Every structure is written in C-alpha cells, then in structure tokens.
Amino acid sequence: MSWLSKLMPSGIRTDNTPSKKRSVPEGLWEKCSNCGSALYRPELEENLEVCPKCGHHMAIRARARLAALFDADSTTEIGARLGPTDLLKFKDQKKYSERIKIAQKNTGEYDALIAMRGLLKGRALVASSFDFAFMGGSMGSVVGERFALAAETAVEIGAPYVCFSQSGGARMQEGLFSLMQMAKTSAALGKLRETGLPYISVLTHPTTGGVSASFAMLGDINIAEPQALIGFAGPRVIEQTVREKLPEGFQRSEFLLEHGAIDQICDRREMRDRLSDLLAMLGRQPAPEVA
C-alpha cells in the first residue's frame, strides 16, 4: 500500500486500487448501422430487427420473419430436407462443396430459402423467405425447387402464396443450373395464376440479380420494405458501365415506388396486418378480426 493510500479515507479508491470488472455477455448490444444507437439485442429481436430510434430495417433471419408472419404453432415446413449438391465440381478460392458445409454450419440451414404452409389469422397461407446469411441468399437448384414446391402446395390447398426476397442473385457456383431456376420459378407462378390464387412478393434489402429479374417482380402486388435496394445490377456497376452519376436514392424502394416499379412500401412491424388485409381483399373475404 502506498503512503497516499494510507492518508486517503476508507472507501475512496485510488488509481492503483484493483477494481472488479463486471462481465458483459457478448452479443447483448448491437449498434444501428444507420443512426449509431446502441440497441439492446432482446428488445431489437422483439422489434423484428427494426431500430426503435430511427426505423432502420436490419437483416432478419428467415425463420424469425416467418414466425412473425404465421399464427403460432400452425406451420409445416416444405422441402425441409432438400440440400444442394456440387454437380459441376466448382472451385474458386474454395470448393463449392466446402462453401456449402460452411454456410450450413454457420446458419443451421440446408439452403437459402425456407418455405412453410400455415395459418395467417386463421386463414391458410403458404410463404417462403430468403436467408441472406446463407451465401448471400443466392438462388441455386434447391432454392428454385423449394419455391416451386411452395407454389404447388398453394395450388393443392387453395391458399395464397407470399415470398420475402433477399438475395444477391443466381448462385454462380451452380452455373446454368442456377439460371434455370429463373424460368422454373416463373413457370410455377404461372400455374398459381391459372388457378386465380394471389401471389404477393415482398422485396427486402437487398433484392438483386436473377431473383429480381424473375419471381421477385411477378407479384399480383409487389411490396417493399423501406430503403431496400432493388434492382438487377448494383448502382456502382451501373455507374461504371454508363459512366454517369445515378440519381440520389436510385434503386431504393422509395424511388421505385415514385416511378411505379412497385406498389407499396410497408414497415416490417406492420407487414403481418398489411398482408392479411390485402389477401382478404384479393380473396374477396371480410378482413379478419385484429389478433
């Protein structure tokens, strides 16, 4: 103990007095990438990954999104055991087969699209959602097959279909097999349309490439989340190609709504009620009671 410590009254800590550090669990707080606010993770999850300070829509996992949409304990997964295979033996910096294993381990999913049937306020619904954490939500053979199975299920049970898109586009590691999914998914929607069943496409940030060029823009109603980037090529690629500066907000959902490319913009926290009301109108049914 130093001479200064002896002179200090008890209870007053000097700089060299050891202090007890409180351990804070990792991942308990998250910083908003838009406004910089420190957000309590449990509250952020309850708010569906939307910043309560500025309304910025952060990435949300596919299962969390679908859980927020469907009635509790009403869902059955479609094509759950379908998993990708490396038919082309593709290799870039890593083998495609290795990338699949890493993505499956990190996400706990077999591929980038989750499809389910269930109830929305007591009414039958089929819905699918991309998981961007799985290889950027890229569309390969399994994504296309699950989407087609979901559309077929909707036809079988006479239910509307909703898809939440969040993707960088076709999966390059599957080559032409991935590009074929653009036609496959569009054809599946054609069968759904023949029956007169509604298809609503919800575009989230980002929705680009082959996904935006196929089923993501084929909805009877196309809805986007606020400030979502939607387009085929990214703005930087376009600027480098045309050698011109793009308008501010180009390819964002607000710009697309203003120019008639989408029908509505909806906050994620209001999406369940909005979809329920729209599907009731499209199905010529009375709006369900608020639940």
Curated annotation (Swiss-Prot):
Zinc finger feature spans (C4-type): 32-54
Keyword Oxidoreductase among record annotations: no
Organism domain of life: Bacteria
Pathway where it operates: Lipid metabolism; malonyl-CoA biosynthesis; malonyl-CoA from acetyl-CoA: step 1/1
PANTHER family given in the database record: ACETYL-COENZYME A CARBOXYLASE CARBOXYL TRANSFERASE SUBUNIT BETA, CHLOROPLASTIC (PTHR42995:SF5)
Assembly and binders: Acetyl-CoA carboxylase is a heterohexamer composed of biotin carboxyl carrier protein (AccB), biotin carboxylase (AccC) and two subunits each of ACCase subunit alpha (AccA) and ACCase subunit beta (AccD).
Family: Belongs to the AccD/PCCB family.
The protein's name: Acetyl-coenzyme A carboxylase carboxyl transferase subunit beta
Organism from which the protein derives: Stenotrophomonas maltophilia (strain K279a)
